[in-house]
């Protein structure tokens, strides 16, 4: 692995993960902009972005009791972003603190690539996780 890949490769792997993990749910996938140009992405950004995405999908599968999942991929000249939203049971962030590694892992991954993480959840309404990482971050 040379440490270089493209966002096109990354998004293809992510689409495969959607099918494997939450493909049995009513799933919609959107790209912003709709026809994205492929851009190079550094190894660390790619790794942490992909594993955070899989964690978000696994959380929907394990905890959300959701019927619908919406995934958005967003690409700008400097950042790659995913947003995973579900219509599941949601949670109170205060009640989740210390009860597992999922939220800590999201924060750690965002910090490692100088990225941003936003988690919104409403009990009985669902959860949205938004994770953004710079395309060129390298943790040497």
Protein language model features and the residues they cover:
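Coiled-coil dimerization/phosphotransfer module
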Residues: 1-140
